């Protein structure tokens, strides 16, 4: 995938909607009073895996051929992306291998395993785990799904903006958290395509 087009976002949103909850906006009286604006939260923590990451993972896997899915999926993560990929792979009956740093909390390891993924502990930090995952991908023919540096993943995450604007067409500002940048890339790009005047930060 080379470009985030409106058509791709629409496709991703339709595919993602099959397996995710459309988390409804929650009005915050407290923050609205504090800011002088109408403030709403989108509670993605209510998704099946506890985070939005499953959106990007599921859409990415949907773009793979049956042959590639049959070979297996791999990623490196110590948190929500691990669970998103594990859950999405399970829905496709695809093998998932998740490489996690050795200091990953046991609760995250067990949660990832609960979705049927094989967990490999390697390295002290994410970069070590990521390097090892790429090595395993090359050795076994797995498809590596990056947590954020992947336009298909970002396109899947962007489905959040589709839901926000569908539910609240008058929204004029979206405040988006940023880590690696996949969520903010997807949300900001789609929001601007749907409403060029909207502000995203």
What would you call each of these model-derived segments?
Residues 1-201:
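PLP-dependent amino-acid enzyme catalytic core
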């Amino acid at each position: 995938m080379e470009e985030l087009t409106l058509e791709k976002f629409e496709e991703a949103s339709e595919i993602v909607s099959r397996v995710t909850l459309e988390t409804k906006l929650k009005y915050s009286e407290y923050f609205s009073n504090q800011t002088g604006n109408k403030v709403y939260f989108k509670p993605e923590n209510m998704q099946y895996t506890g985070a939005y990451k499953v959106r990007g993972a599921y859409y990415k896997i949907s773009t793979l051929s049956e042959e590639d899915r049959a070979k297996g999926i791999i990623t490196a993560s110590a948190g929500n992306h691990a669970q998103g990929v594990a859950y999405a792979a399970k829905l496709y009956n695809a093998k998932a291998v998740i490489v996690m740093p050795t200091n990953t909390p046991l609760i995250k390891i067990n949660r990832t395993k609960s979705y049927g993924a094989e967990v490999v502990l390697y390295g002290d930090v994410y970069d070590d785990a990521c390097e090892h995952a790429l090595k395993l991908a090359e050795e076994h023919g797995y498809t590596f799904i990056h947590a954020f540096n992947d336009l298909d993943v970002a396109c899947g995450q962007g489905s959040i903006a589709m839901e926000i604007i569908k539910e609240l067409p008058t929204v004029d500002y979206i405040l988006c958290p940023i880590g690696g940048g996949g969520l903010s890339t997807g949300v900001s790009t789609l929001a601007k395509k749907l409403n060029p005047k909207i502000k995203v930060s």
